[in-house]
């Protein structure tokens, strides 16, 4: 599902569906999520773009993948804005969470985990990865091997 990630996580936790879906996915059931639904596939909701309109019991999500997901990623910079960019916010997150990795995926793209291999699908055909160990972020294309994110 989509919508507000905080609301989705609260409802998934309240109904017991967070753990139920997680278990079914680990048992082999395909999982597909977009927007908030992709956020909840990661370990926590900490890299959502949403406002905290409600408070879930915790920020813990399904952990179907070992990295954070930031959907709707854009590296657009408006010089008139004067505020933080998405890159600034994601870099701040990994600085205070040194073991974290964030996969920032653009509109109309998705991550496909199949048979133990991870790939980017869709257009535009690039995504960004933010890691504390990297001095700069790295961009990856459709043809790149993304299996390193699974480690």
Predicted regions and their residues:
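Hydrophobic alpha-helical segments and helix pairs
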Residues: 1-2, 7, 20
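Short, structured patches in soluble enzyme cores that scaffold and shape functional sites
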Residues: 2, 10, 25, 66-73
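Glycine-rich nucleotide phosphate-binding loop and flanking beta-alpha elements
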Residues: 5-6, 38-40, 75, 109
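Glycine/threonine-rich flexible loop motifs
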Residues: 5-15, 79-80
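Glycine/Thr-rich phosphate-binding loops of Rossmann-like dinucleotide-binding domains
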Residues: 8-9, 42, 49
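A short, gly/pro- and small-residue-rich
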Residues: 13-27
